[in-house]
A protein has these predicted regions:
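Exposed, flexible binding/inhibitory loops of compact, secreted disulfide-stabilized domains
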Residues: 17-155
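Sec-dependent N-terminal signal peptides
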Residues: 4-12
C-alpha cells in the first residue's frame, strides 16, 4: 500500500518533467547591418528576404537572408530562441529590449542550428522575427537532403 501511495505521489512530478520548450538553438550568427540604415524598406527582387531550412549533420540549419530589422539592434544586439515541442519547432529572432530607433537596416544573413529533431518526422515550423511579427506556420519533413526555401514576402 505504501508503494502505491508513493507511486501516486511521484507520478505527477515525473510527468511534469517531460521535455517541452527546451532551448535548442546553437551557433547563432548574423552579418549586422548591410550598408547604411534607412527610414523605409528596400525594394527589388535582388533584396528578396528568404527563409531557408536545411538538413545539416543531423541538425536543422535555419538561415534568413535580407531581413529588415529596427537598427537599434546594432547597439543592443539580437536574440535567437528555438524550441522543439512534440512536432512543433518554434524559432524566434528579435531585438533585445530597449528604445526603438527611427530607422531600419537590412541584415544580409542570420543563421543558427536547431538540434533535437527526428529524421523522417513531420514538423510544423513557427517563425517570428522582430517584435510581435509572426509569419504563417508551415510544415516540413526533416530528412537528409532537406533544403526548403520560403520567400518571406509571400508567406
Amino acid at each position: 500500500m505504501k508503494k502505491l501511495v508513493l507511486l501516486l505521489l511521484v507520478l505527477p512530478i515525473w510527468a511534469g518533467c517531460t521535455k517541452s520548450e527546451i532551448s535548442r538553438s546553437k551557433e547563432f550568427a548574423h552579418t549586422g547591418c548591410a550598408g547604411d540604415a534607412a527610414t523605409r524598406a528596400w525594394g527589388g527582387d535582388s533584396d528578396a528576404s528568404l527563409l531557408t531550412l536545411k538538413y545539416e549533420d543531423g541538425n536543422l540549419r535555419v538561415t534568413r537572408t535580407n531581413a529588415v530589422l529596427n537598427c537599434a539592434f546594432v547597439q543592443d544586439g539580437l536574440i535567437c530562441e528555438a524550441s522543439v515541442e512534440g512536432n512543433v519547432v518554434r524559432y524566434r529572432v528579435y531585438e533585445k529590449e530597449g528604445p526603438r530607433a527611427n530607422c531600419i537596416c537590412r541584415v544580409e544573413e542570420m543563421s543558427s542550428l536547431v538540434t533535437g529533431l527526428e529524421v523522417g518526422k513531420e514538423y510544423t515550423f513557427e517563425y517570428s522575427c522582430g517584435f510581435g511579427y509572426n509569419y504563417p506556420s508551415f510544415t516540413f519533413v526533416f530528412k537528409k537532403g532537406l533544403r526548403l526555401i520560403q520567400n518571406t514576402a509571400t508567406m
